[in-house]
């Protein structure tokens, strides 16, 4: 009995350790890579499938993956996605190339970019500056300290605050006040503002609420991987609303990130398979109250129910609608302190008024768009403590209409356009020069797009804001003023009564503050509406030269550039100067060419004022123009030039992918890169049921120390490899079992003979989905056909690299046939060890007997020849051998 007890205990311990190793939350793995040297000296490679487990919450710098090949670090890095997948980042070839949301990403931060913001000196300030500028300095100081451990702890404390009772929140000191500089608000007001924000945040369930990152980069990539870009600021990033008048909060999709619901195909990226199309159509979005951020600049008009819940401090979520309405222009407060102390009107709108806003005409009513003037509230007012939406302390003094920003002073305007405010949710017109120095051309959704979840809105599919006017003036040398344009603006009723206005020679179409005639604007709008694609930039430029009336050359500057330039620091003499390119905020690193072609003819608002107000140094302009509107996309493959820099040698090359985190140390994934030639011959071998005796037990028993390998297979494979053939091991196991499977192949030993080394091709999908597909569904051929076809395409198109294949099921035979393996060299083995050739199924053999015929079935590959038998059916063994002599049966009798 003691024997049995010890054996059972050993088995339990082994199984427990095995489970720890295959836990899907901690699985990390790397699929081997095949690089094929072509006849012309170029290279092609299979995808780099690398996955790290349990690394979901990392900072931007901790998402950079280092690569070592043959023990030496290489100048090549990968980036970590939301689901632990690694990918390369490459710049798009075309400036306005349209990318799917799941492919767009941000560039990999480098060491210089990571520490550049910390080493940037503070901007010199003049003695007569306003006291409110101290808040800007505090913002800078906090942004320089974003990498400290204290800031991480403060962020955790803020998360815990949302879970506490709201009464305690009113009495507790706000930890956020330590992170963000005061903007002329008293401490009592700040506490009440924090309490109001806490009650609003508490109305969302914990799993439905995703706190916006406090530190976001000025180089804003809306389709990033849920990470932060190199340069950090203290402003949260805006999300992409569904529309300008309504914001709907979708239910939590956190489960989509969990392992069993992610589908990862060969050569692709992880995609969610939990939400079906039917579920999407049947889904009714829930709405919740929100707190306005500095990126929206809209007034929030909540429903009556949400206000009652805030008064009662109830943290439950109900089906209420939160409507955002653009305010009308109003007078700006003269003093910054007065403006900072203002707040929203206390009287909420009734529910019928809110519902009418949703069904209103495109021309809003005055009652909906003209909120009452904000009044300075007394510090001890008891009504301020209840039911009032306080402004976020990240925001400026008050909401303001965008057209009124021209009258602001630079330090006041900076409060409305912080350094990170690149407006990722705004629509972008393709031929325009984007605002952010390295922003992706598509401004859609959120960081969750990389994990396969849906974006709230794809603004690249929306039409731009188009305004019609009969002001004329495109054929004149003078500029089109905004007053003149608005004076002759065409309303909907006028256009409905007389659509022939498009033939009027004075018709001017304004598209994002640029003016065009109908001949040019029509194809641009039509292309976006019909094909959901923008016209190429080259086409638009040539179209402008042909269709627009000629004018004198001038600079193309956008209105956002004007507000950006006004934010540039002033010297003591009061003159604007442009700092060096490396010290510019990300908003100042313009992606556009500062001086266009001389025949640029489209008009732009406010350009004359810019030319008069600032003189840009030519060297700086040239530096900015070379920044380019570069957008970046994910990739799993390297180019031929990148592969050449790796300095691979023929055969296996050990590669290690490592990522270092502050709390988890260094995590490594080891694999192998195999360099083959274009004329190599490859033998395909399955693992489960082919090398092992069965599919299911072959994955479990070897981990318990039990040898479950077919006898004679190691010697057969070794003999075939000595004749010059390459081996490729293809299994439908999951990528998380790569190390386990690779270790098993090295562990197989048949009286001193081991299996030859070869690339291990596994499924990049999850552990349980791969196990279910291979063992339960018994359909591993789906993955194998995709994988083997991809490997086949790496070789010359006219060549067949696969010489023979070994499997154990009809599914394997079907997959091998689909990739071009001759059926005369497809072998299957059953659990008894009987080897069957597909062409002659009645003839059963074994691995031992086939080893005796290796020289005939797998002849030695000559170095001078590309293959042993170009036509194997006419080989000396099958055709060119001496015929059997005729025998006289009478003599034998």
From Swiss-Prot:
GO MF entries: phosphatidate phosphatase activity; transcription coactivator activity
Localization per Swiss-Prot or TrEMBL? Nucleus; Cytoplasm, Cytosol; Endoplasmic reticulum membrane
The record's account of tissue expression is: Expressed at high level in liver and to some extend in lung, kidney, placenta, spleen, thymus, lymph node, prostate, testes, small intestine, and colon. Expressed also in circulating red blood cells and site of lymphopoiesis.
Q: Which domain of life is it from?
A: Eukaryota
Q: Where is this motif: DXDXT motif?
A: 686-690
* Any Pfam family the entry gives: Lipin_N
- Major localization class: nucleus
**Compositionally skewed regions (Low complexity) per UniProt:** 360-371
Ways its activity is controlled: Inhibited by N-ethylmaleimide.
Positions of short motif Nuclear localization signal: 153-158
Q: Which GO terms describe its biological process?
A: fatty acid metabolic process; lipid metabolic process; positive regulation of transcription by RNA polymerase II; triglyceride biosynthetic process
Query: What cofactor does this chain's UniProt record say it requires?
Result: Mg(2+)
Q: What is the effect of changing residue 731 to D?
A: Abolishes phosphatidate phosphatase activity but does not prevent membrane association
> Where do the record's region annotations for C-LIP lie?
632-834
The EC number(s) attached to this protein equal 3.1.3.4
What's in the domain note?
A: Contains 1 Asp-Xaa-Asp-Xaa-Thr (DXDXT) motif, a catalytic motif known to be essential for phosphatidate phosphatase activity.
Q: Which PANTHER family match?
A: LIPIN, PHOSPHATIDATE PHOSPHATASE LPIN2
**Protein name from the UniProt record:** Phosphatidate phosphatase LPIN2
UniProt organism field: Mus musculus
| Gene encoding the protein | Lpin2
């Amino acid at each position: 009995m003691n024997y049995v007890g010890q054996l059972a205990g050993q088995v339990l311990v082994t199984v427990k350790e095995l489970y720890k190793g295959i836990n899907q939350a901690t699985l990390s793995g790397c699929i081997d890579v095949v690089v094929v040297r072509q006849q012309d000296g170029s290279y092609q490679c299979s995808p780099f499938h690398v996955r790290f487990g349990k690394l979901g919450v990392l900072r931007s710098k901790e998402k950079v993956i280092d690569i070592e090949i043959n023990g030496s670090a290489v100048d090549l890095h990968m980036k970590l996605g939301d689901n632990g997948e690694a990918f390369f980042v490459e710049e798009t070839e075309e400036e306005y190339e349209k990318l799917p949301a799941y492919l767009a990403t941000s560039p990999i931060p480098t060491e210089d970019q990571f520490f550049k913001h910390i080493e940037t000196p503070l901007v010199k300030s003049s003695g007569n500056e306003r006291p409110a500028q101290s808040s800007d300095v505090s913002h800078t100081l906090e942004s320089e300290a974003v990498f400290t451990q204290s800031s991480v702890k403060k962020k955790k404390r803020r998360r815990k605050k949302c879970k506490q009772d709201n009464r305690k929140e009113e009495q507790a000191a706000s930890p956020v006040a330590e992170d963000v500089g005061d903007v002329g608000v008293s401490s009592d007001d700040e506490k009440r503002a924090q309490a109001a924000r806490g009650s609003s945040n508490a109305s969302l369930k914990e799993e439905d609420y995703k706190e916006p990152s406090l530190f976001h980069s000025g180089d804003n990539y809306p389709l990033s991987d849920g990470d932060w870009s190199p340069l950090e600021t203290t402003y949260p990033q805006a999300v992409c609303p569904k529309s300008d008048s309504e914001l709907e909060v979708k239910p939590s999709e956190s489960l989509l990130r969990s392992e069993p619901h992610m589908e990862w195909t060969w050569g692709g990226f992880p995609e969610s398979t939990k939400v079906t199309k039917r579920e999407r159509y049947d889904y009714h979005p829930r709405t919740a109250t929100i707190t306005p951020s500095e990126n929206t600049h809209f007034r929030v008009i909540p429903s009556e129910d949400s206000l009652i819940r805030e008064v009662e401090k109830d943290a439950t979520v109900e089906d209420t609608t939160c409507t955002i309405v653009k305010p009308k222009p109003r007078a700006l407060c003269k003093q910054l302190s007065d403006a900072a102390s203002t707040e929203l009107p206390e009287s909420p709108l009734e529910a019928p008024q809110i519902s009418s806003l949703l069904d209103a005409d495109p021309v809003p009513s005055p009652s909906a768009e003209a909120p009452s003037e904000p009044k300075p509230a007394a510090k001890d007012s008891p009504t301020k403590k209840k039911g009032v939406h306080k402004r976020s302390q990240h925001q400026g003094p008050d909401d303001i209409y965008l057209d009124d920003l021209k009258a602001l002073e630079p330090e006041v305007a900076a409060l409305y356009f912080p350094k990170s405010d690149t407006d990722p949710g705004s629509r972008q017109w393709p031929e325009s020069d984007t605002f952010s120095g390295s922003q992706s051309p598509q401004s859609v959704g959120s960081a969750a797009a990389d994990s396969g979840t849906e974006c709230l809105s794809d603004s690249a599919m929306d039409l731009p804001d188009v305004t019609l006017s009969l002001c004329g003036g495109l054929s004149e040398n003078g500029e089109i003023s905004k007053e003149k344009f608005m004076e002759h603006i065409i309303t909907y009723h006028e256009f409905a009564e007389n659509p022939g206005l498009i033939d009027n020679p004075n018709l001017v179409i304004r598209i994002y503050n640029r003016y065009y005639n109908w001949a040019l604007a029509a194809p641009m709008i039509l292309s976006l509406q019909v094909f959901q694609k923008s016209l190429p930039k080259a086409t638009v430029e040539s179209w402008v030269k042909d269709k627009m009336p000629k004018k004198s050359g001038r600079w193309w500057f956008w209105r956002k550039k004007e507000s950006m330039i006004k934010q540039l620091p002033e010297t003591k003499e009061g003159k604007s100067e442009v700092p060096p390119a490396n010290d510019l905020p990300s908003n100042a690193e313009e992606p556009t060419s500062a001086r266009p072609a001389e025949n640029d003819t489209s008009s732009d608002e406010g350009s004359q004022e810019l030319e008069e107000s600032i003189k840009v140094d030519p060297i700086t302009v040239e530096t900015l123009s070379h920044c380019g509107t570069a957008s970046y996309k994910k990739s799993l493959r390297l180019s031929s030039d990148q592969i050449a820099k790796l300095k691979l040698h023929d055969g296996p090359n050990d590669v290690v992918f490592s990522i270092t985190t502050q709390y988890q140390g260094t995590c490594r994934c080891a694999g192998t890169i195999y360099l083959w030639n274009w004329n190599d011959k490859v033998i395909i071998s399955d693992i489960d049921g082919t090398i092992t005796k069965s599919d299911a037990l072959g994955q479990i028993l070897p981990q318990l120390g039990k040898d479950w390998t077919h006898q004679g297979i190691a010697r057969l494979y070794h003999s075939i490899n000595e004749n010059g053939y390459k081996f490729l091991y293809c299994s439908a196991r999951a990528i998380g079992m790569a190390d386990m499977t690779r270790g098993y192949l090295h562990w197989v030993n048949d009286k001193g003979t081991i299996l030859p080394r070869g690339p291990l091709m596994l499924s990049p999908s999850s552990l349980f989905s791969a196990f279910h597909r291979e063992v339960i569904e018994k359909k591993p051929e789906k993955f194998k056909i995709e994988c083997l076809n991809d490997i086949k395409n790496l070789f010359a198109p006219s060549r067949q690299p696969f010489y023979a294949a070994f499997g154990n099921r009809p599914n394997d035979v079907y997959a091998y046939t689909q990739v071009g393996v001759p059926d005369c060299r497809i072998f299957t083995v059953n659990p008894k060890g009987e080897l069957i050739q597909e062409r002659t199924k009645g003839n059963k053999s074994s691995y031992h007997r086939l080893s005796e015929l290796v020289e005939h079935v797998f002849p030695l590959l000559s170095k001078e020849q590309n293959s042993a038998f170009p036509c194997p059916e006419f080989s000396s063994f099958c055709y060119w051998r001496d015929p059997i002599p005729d025998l006289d049966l009478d003599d034998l009798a």
